[in-house]
């Protein structure tokens, strides 16, 4: 959240940027058996953080997105980007040469889809480890005040669960401009009265940054 907010410090005053995460990441203790696995799947940067530093540089990391891949590489993994989303990763792995060794998917407590069983059905030896929890949080007082005051608000939303939590806490978003990382996030707001709902061209940090800047410029001109 802090990294994303820093992209807009030139366009906005400090008090115009409100950081109020709706999810708190809590990492679990790593199992000792983790060091025995030589091929990991990371579908988010939090999965990489949960795994921590690679035991050696021969551990293969199959990653979703540039940010996840770069982080895995910086922590010593032999990291490969296998698509921009889980669907692309699954399709690429199923089309390519089968991986003979065990694969471990490291993900959070709340995850969409069933990647592990889909890979098993495709003939892979795949297991999973829940490396972290995503604990729901209430909006901060400054964030609530902004909604109550009727301010124009730009809301970059990076996950479907975050979107659902926001919708539950703030059912009316008619002064809010929602920046959705994916169609799944945008669809959460189909029946919500919002100022606007826009979907990033690519489901990653770069796509969200680009769209947020564009919407911000339009809102500032209103």
Residues of each region from the PLM?
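Signature of uroporphyrinogen-III synthase
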Residues: 1-222
